[in-house]
Structures are given as structure tokens and as C-alpha cells.
Amino acid sequence: MYVDSAYWRNSRIDFKDRRHPLFVGSCGTYRLLSITKLPTHRPRGRIDFQLLYVAAGKGHFYYNGKEHIIPAGNMVLYRPREEQRYYYYGADHTEVFWIHFTGSDVTNILRHYGFKDGEHVIHSGTSLEYSHIFQQIIGELKECQPHYEEACIYRLHLLFILLDPCHLYPFAFTLKGSLDSICHS
């Protein structure tokens, strides 16, 4: 198994940040090469948000009491205090990127970028650009260069912009009406 991850101030403890509208706590990637199963179960969730990008293979995610098999080209969003239960299997050759984030205005920021309340799966398609953003955030958290916290936040905003339905499907929206009125009303 290949693992690359980094944590703000090298702490694996989840936290809630109220000083910033958005703040990155940790970021990483897993690529299953030799192990048969990688389970995660947090019955009470965490106090931050988690976004997982299935870049290859598939993941078995549980939400609303049911198993959902999520293939590559999708992202899964878990909110604070929400049970997190998911599994990756080696036979699926899964590669996943993940990020934990918090902040005083996360819910409104997600809404601004088109995330719906209660939505778990974001159909993103596969893109090396997503993987690159996650890898950049991992690098920033590892190197801790000046302004790295802001750089992580900037890159997470960039990811959200790329996931905005108005960015992913602009032609579908222009057929129904003006892009501004649909996307930012």
C-alpha cells in the first residue's frame, strides 16, 4: 500500500477552527497495491469535514444507513459528527485522495460552490488536476513554508471551484438560462 499524508502541526487529532472561515487540517492519499482491505469506521464521525476523491478503482461508502459503491470519478463528502464508514479493497486497485477541513463558515462556502445540504456524492469525473491539487496541499502541509496555511486554503477553494456544477457543466446551464442567474442566485 502506498500512503502519503500530512497534518497541520503534525497532529492527527481532529479540531474545529472558528478563527478562519475555512482551514485545512490534513490531507493525504492511499493507493492499495498489496493489502486486501482498508477499513475506516468512525461511528460518531469527526468534528471536521472530510472530502474523499476516488481517483481509481472504487470505494464502499456507507451513509444514510446503506452501502454505496462509489467508482472513480466521484467525491464523497462527510460532515461533522456524521458516521464515517468506508472500505477499500485491494482487488479494486483503489486510489483515493482525502482532505479534512474546518472553519467558521464552511457550510456557507460549500453552498456557494454548489454543494447541496445533505449531499454525499459529487460527480466530479476523473482529472489529474484534482490529484495535483491534493498533492500540492500535502506538500504545503509537509514543508510548512511561509504562508503555507493560506496556500492550503487557496488550493481547497480552487478544488471547490472546479467542482462547482457551473464550472463542470457550463453548457447545460446556459441552455436553461443565464449562467449567473442559475449558478449564483
Residue ranges and their predicted role:
Residues 1-68, 117-118:
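Generic protein-terminus/edge-of-domain signal
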Residues 67, 81-105:
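Ligand-binding loop in jelly-roll beta-barrel domains
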Residues 109-174, 181-185:
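Amphipathic alpha-helical segments enriched in hydrophobic/aromatic residues interleaved with Lys/Arg
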Residues 35-38, 72-73, 81-83, 91:
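Tight coil/turn sites that cap or link beta-strands
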